């Protein structure tokens, strides 16, 4: 076979399934009792803290509803809830619309040690990181604040009396007046959604010409926004805070994105991985529950492996990860597979298989059959 990512993926051997013996032992239990949401009827489900759970099942079987219900129930009980909806639309998930979510009770089991109380809930969805070009990779991850500091510390910036705000494309002094720092101009089209075209004055640089007279190591701040993550890792190798953020982006397979890539040009999967990387660079030990809906959508198998490495690292640090997933490469590596079904809609909403991937592979269910088939060569 060809030695390239796709060639290696096609030639990859059978999936290795986590066995009962290999699965992590939960450090505590999270119980959801009597869930009545959409297709879920009087359902009781337990999740193991400090483990990796993959919720699988056919489309419409209730996977996402279960995840939303877990999120809503936890949200009322944790100190910090990071729901990425704050930057995107305020539209509510299915479980939040129905109103009966309040009936769902979450009990932290008695064997939950006080030192692993959950104090953070992080929901990572595929909502955009912003709706206009004003939000970009560098601003969302926070690394741009540190880059601006470097520019403000240059002799030339000090000589001119400029502070970090001069190097923000959201501030009048530094930004291009024509596009107001967006680097693009929205074109209104009759009967069609508007689209963006590069600014005729700054040509996408976002800044006015005076701001671009200041350089750091021979680069303007607009040059920095043009760097890809991979290029920026070399440029900022000695700046630990920036390098750490870049390493996290690289770890989820985003080496190819430009630092200034506008939110409007990012796919849902890319947005989700940017959020994950932003979390990874500040991941504390334990105490956090991460919920993700289809994190591998649109990913190449090589990127799925990168993502799995990072998710496993979160769990190794004592955190809890629950994902809804169609990708069997993810399910195979989970500690536990929770399969919803047996069908969709009214014919779904039940747990039809539950156990380590190796155990589920022995059941005659949709996920079980695929795991069995993919794990035997």
Predicted regions and their residues:
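Conserved phosphate-binding elements of NTP-dependent enzyme cores
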Residues: 1-377
